Amino acid sequence: MKKNAFFFAFIRENCTLVYYKPRYFLEDFMHIAIAGNIGSGKTTLTSLLAKHYKWTPHYEDADDNPYLNDFYDDMQRWSFNLQVYFLNSRFGQVQEIRQGKQKVVQDRTIYEDAYIFAPNLHAMGLMTTRDYENYFSLFKLMDSLVKAPDLIIYLRASVPTLVKQIQKRGRDYENSIRLDYLKRLNERYEAWITTYEGGKLLIVDIDEVNFSESKEDLGKVIRMIDAEVNGLFK
C-alpha cells in the first residue's frame, strides 16, 4: 500500500454509504516554519524539505532588504528600520501563507524578530526604548491577526557552528557580525523556545547533524519531522 493511499472504512447505515479516512488526509493546508539563529541552516533546510515533501517554500526576504548592509555597518542607526521592514515582510508572508491554503515550509518566523532580535538590540543599547516599544506594539497588533505555524522546527546550534556556517556561505554584510552578538541571540532563542506554547515544536541539534552535506543526517531530520507531522491532526 502506498504511503499516501487513503484508507476507507465503509459502514452502511439506512442504505447510506459512509466513508471515513484519517483526519491527516483531510487537511490540504499545513504551515511548517523553520526557526534558528543566523547561520543555523534555515534556508538550506527549507529548500531540502520543500523538495522532499513537495511543499511550497517561503524564504526570508534578506537579500532584498534595503537596510541590511547599512544595519551591519551601523546597528544603532538602522536597527529600528531593519526590524520594522522584517516585521512587515513576515506579516505579509504569513497572510499570504494562510490565504493560499497549501502545505508550506517557511524560512524564519514572525516571532523571532519580536522575541529575539529586537529585544536583543534594545538590551545592547542599539535600539532606543521609544523605538523598541513602538516596534513591539506593532508586533502585538500583527500577532493578534495571524495564527501560529502548525509546527516550528528550531535549529539549535553553538556559536562555533554558527560562525563556521556563516563563513562558509560568505555573505559580505555578515563579515562584521561579532561573536558576542551571536551568543546573545542564542541565549534569547533558548529563552523563547523554553516558553513557546503556540503549537508543536521540534528541536534539531545542528552540532550533531549536517543535513546540508549528509543524506543520512537529512534522513534523520525527515524521520523526526514525519513523526511530528503525522501526529499533527490526530
Question: Would you name each region that the model predicts?
Answer:
Residues 163-234:
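NTP-dependent small-molecule kinase module
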Residues 51-89:
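Conserved substrate/cofactor phosphate-moiety recognition/catalytic segment
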Residues 115-190:
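A glycine- and Lys/Arg-enriched "phosphate-lid" helix/loop adjacent to the NTP-binding pocket
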Residues 42:
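Conserved lysine of the Walker
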